[in-house]
Amino acid sequence: NKPIHLRAKAGIGYLSQQRSVFAISVYDNLLGICQLCIKGTSNQIKMTEQLLDEFNLQHLRDIHASNLSGGEVRRLMLARLLINKPSIVLLDEPMAALDPIVVQEIQKYILKLQNFGCAVLITDHQVNNLFDIVDRAYVLGEQSIIAQGTTAEILKSSKAIELYFGPSYRA
């Protein structure tokens, strides 16, 4: 129940399912957060440029964020998330409303979060989008954990199949 700024200071980053970018350029979306979190103008610019490169946003740097596609917005949001150097990142439906090609792209960027030293926790209703990128999964239902383990273990869980995937699900 802590306010967002205290969660950020505690090393927790959060990516909302909703579009959450400022109505300014891609570059300024990143630089603005850098100015709040990083000391020194040269360090702020360096981090902004690094994130533009790392998340393939360099060609969009001067584009107004409201003109970005869903996948481009997700990449910008993921990049912004890293500015405060969180140790834990919470992603809420990070691939919601994205087409299959963009989902694959976002999966690669989610995997990159580990390169920044982040533990990643993802909530998503479309678990098929996650099976290739997670080490462990938990299926929740009936107000408790109904299955947990590796992807293979989850797919063998009769309770997960019955209550979440449905009887016609084929792995």
Where are these regions (language model features)?
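Conserved ABC ATPase signature
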Residues: 64-68, 72
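Catalytic Walker B motif of ABC-type/P-loop ATPase nucleotide-binding domains
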Residues: 89-93
